[in-house]
């Protein structure tokens, strides 16, 4: 439970925050209806701990990839080889479940630990914990254990399971028995709540919301999903979607205004830059939700507008990193890794927006995406030249966070680049 940041307390659940700058939101046709594997059974008015066992999450039937992949170049294979070596060795650390789930994101549900064991089975067996909802016991993952990150972002495990195509019915060892991915979904639903009137929510803050939103939307069994959360709050996935989009749009407003004025924005401690990966996960979570048919039409327009904003942000933020490296050479290595983080997440987010039907790049925009891919290659080579990839143990001994960034951002760079190249697809 955490108090909401005051900047968005005017957002009320069920009443979409007025976005403003409506001229920035592009008109578009009605969204296509998401496909589901099979018709879902009739749902009750609201799910609760009393009937949640009857909820059957449904994996999406639609699978897509970018319509015009970035043209192949040998440099991409070299960069991916370097990144893959990092992920296969260091994301496969049995003692780092957060890293393992990044390996799953990059390489799919068959990702294996460095010792050859299945990564997902190990994460469930070693780190899942019982989660009680009254007399009902399901499962969940802790934020950390023994100072090791497990789910520093709420619902990271479920989000990655849903995104990489794991069957909700898939079972995993937990304690002396087994549990299913569907059990994790049910628990996530029940523990998700927002009480605007009291300025409280179940997350650690706005930045903590998008993983759960994406997961709940991806496996939603019907076009409407309502539930009574463990605190008694009545929740609706449409409202949760609208609320998340409203937060995203408000925190992006200073960029929209600068873009409309033909100016560059400046980084002055705006909240968006404190969000995970510059707000990329907020965009991705909101994108999945609106593409799956949740939220109001205004929310879909607001998320689609993020594509233009990302194109605008690309050269400005790269220039910020490059200028900082010139001025603060002592921080060059950390800034290079931040550059990798930005580019990998940028390619991942842009590709997802396209696949989800929220953005269709024209020739100029496609060239910009190709430029981002080439910049990622340059960044990987620069990090390699600094000796970071070849001395991961040394990096870890000096700076644990830099080590974690190298592992996690290598995984996102693989996901982003391979989506842009058309080598990976997305189920939605």
Where are these regions (language model features)?
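Preference for long, amphipathic alpha-helical scaffolds in soluble/luminal domains
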Residues: 13-428
